[in-house]
Amino acid sequence: MKKNKYGFLIRFLMKICLWGVAFFLILTYVIGFFRATGNSMFPSIKDGDLCILYKIEESHTNDIVLYKTSDGKERLGRIVAVGEQKVNFPEEGGYTVNDYQPAEEITYETYRAEKSDMKYPITLEKDEYFILNDYRSDTSDSREYGVVKKEDIEGKLIFILRRRGF
C-alpha cells in the first residue's frame, strides 16, 4: 500500500519537473520579454511598455526587433534594410534604400547621425540589417552604432503590454 502512495508522489513530482524544464526552455529559446525604456520607438512603443518577443522567426524589413549594440546594450528598433541593400542619407534629409524612399505609415524626419563615422551610401552584407528608431531624432541606432549582424538580433516583437495609458 505504501508503495502506491510513493509511486503517485514520484510521478507527480516528475510531471512538475518536466513542466518546469519545458517552461524554462520556452522562455530561454522561444519567447523573450523586454521592458522598453526611453522614447526611441515612440509612438509605436512607449517608455515602460512590456514587449514580448519571438526568438525563432527570421526578421524582415519593417519588423521591430530587440538587438545588441556594439557596446553591449539591448535596444529596440525597426529594420529598414536587409542584406545586400544599399542605404543612403542624402544631405537634404530623409533616407533611401536602393535609391528609393521607403513608404512609411508615419513620415519621420530622418537625418544622419552627427557623431558617427559611417560613410554613405553603405551596402549591407548578407545577414546584416540597418535599423532605425521610430523617433528618428534619437540617432542611437544603426546611424550611430553601425549595421546589426543577424546573430545580434535577439527577437522579433510580437506583442506589447501597455503599462501606462493607451
Model-derived features: where do they sit?
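Soluble "head" domains of membrane/secretory-pathway proteins
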Residues: 2-10, 14, 29-35, 43-166
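Sec-dependent signal peptide hydrophobic core
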Residues: 13-21
